[in-house]
Amino acid sequence: MAELKPLIAKVANGESLNREDARTAFDILMSGEATPSQIGGFLMALRVRGETVDEIVGAVSSMRARMLPVSAPANAIDIVGTGGDGIGTYNISTLASIITAGTGLPVAKHGNRALSSKSGTADALSALGVRLDIGPDLIARCIAEAGLGFMFAQMHHSAMRHVGPSRVELGTRTIFNLLGPLSNPAGAKRQLLGVFSPRWLVPLAEVLRDLGSESIWVVHGDGMDEVTTTGVTHVAALEDGKIRTFDLTPKDFGVEPALMNDLKGGDGIANAAALREVLSGKRNAYRDISLCNAAAALVIAGKAETLSQAMTIASDALDSGKAAAALDRLVAVSNEANSGQE
């Protein structure tokens, strides 16, 4: 096994790692060969100097090589955020994923429990009755039958256990906050990816381009890792191998601007109840912002040509009950787990 010490020294001296060296470093971290001090020192040296595109590509390559894969259709999309925006909103990408599934576009959603908020995707889905601890075959069935499957990060990235304690002890953001959303176990090549800071918009679009993604929007909206209805959403879009940047406002989606307080959520149980209310017909700011994110996903996937058309398709999936049916089917199929599928 290669040595981590010279790579730590290199980063500590302000130098950047090439992709090969970054891959080597993260192979060492993920194999359990590094000490807690080495892990903490390396992660903080990267953080203080600033992670580069090549370093993230190398790290993601290491993550992907070790993940437990899931089979999904080629046109599947992932709607995911880095988390870490510290705002504590409702589970927007979760509801957007359910709506998107209701339109007939398959969603291979990757996520985790809350880290900095009260409710991550896993918390809300668990409260809705979705079983999380299921194997790849059953997740693939969920995607095929419900149009939506959830891949619980800790089930698919077991090598992360080697760095978990150090991350907790550091108590601050590291490169790993970026790696999860870039390491979808279903290999989804289409993504709506929300980031906690606008500085990561173009770099992460470049990372995903270099890793073979096809159609991606990396978004940041008014402090949130989502398309927002409270102000301007900044977008870096990967289309046909090229990256372009643009801004969106609520007007582009045909919705009224919202106040941030109208989007503040609670814990998993409270957020699950709010999500069910929208599926049952409640019209509020949570509905609007989730529709906007679903609409963005439809445009990314080529299921709609314009945001206006996409909003119509997404609204129909919600109002017709197709989105609610997708969730109900996800709950049913995920709970069919037996000892052979654990």
Swiss-Prot record:
Its EC number is 2.4.2.18. Mg(2+) 2 binds at residues 225-226. One of its GO terms (molecular function) is magnesium ion binding. It is an enzyme of class 2 (transferase). Anthranilate 1 binds at residues 81, 112. 5-phospho-alpha-D-ribose 1-diphosphate binds at residues 81, 84-85, 89, 91-94, 109-117, 121. Anthranilate 2 binds at residue 167. Its cofactor is Mg(2+). One of its GO terms (biological process) is L-tryptophan biosynthetic process. Pfam families: Glycos_trans_3N (PF02885), Glycos_transf_3 (PF00591). Binds 2 magnesium ions per monomer. Catalyzes the transfer of the phosphoribosyl group of 5-phosphorylribose-1-pyrophosphate (PRPP) to anthranilate to yield N-(5'-phosphoribosyl)-anthranilate (PRA). PANTHER family: ANTHRANILATE PHOSPHORIBOSYLTRANSFERASE. Homodimer. Belongs to the anthranilate phosphoribosyltransferase family. This is Anthranilate phosphoribosyltransferase. It comes from Agrobacterium fabrum (strain C58 / ATCC 33970) (Agrobacterium tumefaciens (strain C58)). The gene is trpD.
